[in-house]
Amino acid sequence: MNYIFKTALFVAALALAAGGGKTGQNAETQDTAAVQQETGPHADNDLNREYVATLGGHRFEINIKRTADATLPAVSDELGSTFYDNRVEITATRDGEELFTKQFTKSDFADFVPAADSKGCVLLGMAFDQENSSAATLRFGAQIGQPGIEEGPAFIVEIPAGGGACSIVRDMRQDTMGEEGEQ
């Protein structure tokens, strides 16, 4: 009986020693893989939104495409992570005919935000505002902010449907900067 007990104990110890070595090696590999960090700037996912609206008897088709742009200056957040800034392209057609194609970057909004408030921020994106658009003027909302936080100064962008320069104003109703941004 004592012989069987000792043999069983020896086999169990051998099994633990053999399995324990592999587990330790696998655990080390898994820990190493989990600790490795990505190199280079981070980028937002590309975003493509399509809108269809009937305004003043005309059918408008609007495409808004956001892409991370490595040609724009990269920004760093409070933790030192680096991010590519985004470029947003808006294409609009009226009754099947191209109206305009415009590209926006964070610099288009620089006149409306103090440099200190836009530090570490990217152009988060833009969206079509159908409720406040008309056949004469298409209205969009835009926002800049820190990557991943999605808070920051908001803007109203109006583009004349007949062509011409767009207008940009700070949207204090949608602004998520808090009281500091309202001064």
Where do the protein language model's features map onto the residues?
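Surface-exposed acidic loop/strand-edge motifs in secreted or periplasmic proteins
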Residues: 41-125
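Short beta-strand segments
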Residues: 99-102, 151-155, 166-167
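Short, low-complexity, disordered segments immediately C-terminal to signal peptides
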Residues: 20-39
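Sec-dependent bacterial lipoprotein signal peptides
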Residues: 1-22
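Short, low-complexity, Pro/Ser/Thr/Gly-rich segments in the mature regions of secreted, periplasmic
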Residues: 163-183
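Beta-propeller blade signature
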Residues: 86-92, 155-162
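Short, solvent-exposed coil/turn segments at beta-strand boundaries
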Residues: 55-57, 94-96, 132-139, 162-163
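Acidic, glycine-rich flexible loop segments
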Residues: 114-154, 160
